[in-house]
Amino acid sequence: MSEQTIYGANTPGGSGPRTKIRTHHLQRWKADGHKWAMLTAYDYSTARIFDEAGIPVLLVGDSAANVVYGYDTTVPISIDELIPLVRGVVRGAPHALVVADLPFGSYEAGPTAALAAATRFLKDGGAHAVKLEGGERVAEQIACLTAAGIPVMAHIGFTPQSVNTLGGFRVQGRGDAAEQTIADAIAVAEAGAFAVVMEMVPAELATQITGKLTIPTVGIGAGPNCDGQVLVWQDMAGFSGAKTARFVKRYADVGGELRRAAMQYAQEVAGGVFPADEHSF
């Protein structure tokens, strides 16, 4: 019997037995032309919901710096702040592939530092893979991790950890810079990455790279032709502030509903409406 996935019959959107998603499923989906979704997750409860919804890949992103800890950028967050979040997500999502971000400062020094950081996420956090930002400049780190048996998702284009160097949140790979983005994509693939995130890259360039690579591409602000797509769940579900990036589509108003529920709860407590007899022993 062939191995089944969360989607059933190994195809996104299908039905059937639910088993663990592995990196080879993503490779197969690329070969078969099946697109798939990835979301961030930072705790047990939301990870459980996303797993039940059939999201095959969950990213414990360093975006937790913004949406969990309230930092202005992703730069300050540490391994020690991320690992407890990874543990919760892994427990809540028995079927999804859980990828953990290596935070700024944990891998730039070279392969030895990258291996130490990634090992912590797998051993202490239970992550199934790690993600790190950069193209050619981190190819050696990627090769080291994959040689050690650690699956790596790469991240090129706009890399949030380099926001200060890049001069803010800007589209990458326009004009002459396109060749460097292509070189970065090829470098991470040749180093052994099982997939590559492309952030804020022109759609035409992302399409070209997706066609060149044998590994899956994951877009975030990179057009519709990547093999997968990823969003921060708070942006996707309307839980973050009113202003979001152009590439975000809101599928709900979770923030508004939570605010309404909290206000109603407070009003009913103040007015003596809650708890009522049916809520008492």
Swiss-Prot record:
Lineage: Bacteria, Bacillati, Actinomycetota, Actinomycetes, Mycobacteriales
Binding site for 3-methyl-2-oxobutanoate: D62, S63, D101, K131
Protein name: 3-methyl-2-oxobutanoate hydroxymethyltransferase
Further comment found in the protein's record: Was identified as a natural substrate of the M.tuberculosis proteasome. Was identified as a high-confidence drug target.
Active-site residues, record numbering mapped to chain: E199
Annotated positions of the N-acetylserine modification: S2
Assembly notes: Homodecamer; pentamer of dimers.
Spans traversing the lipid bilayer: none
Annotated organism of origin: Mycobacterium tuberculosis (strain ATCC 25618 / H37Rv)
Annotated compartments: Cytoplasm
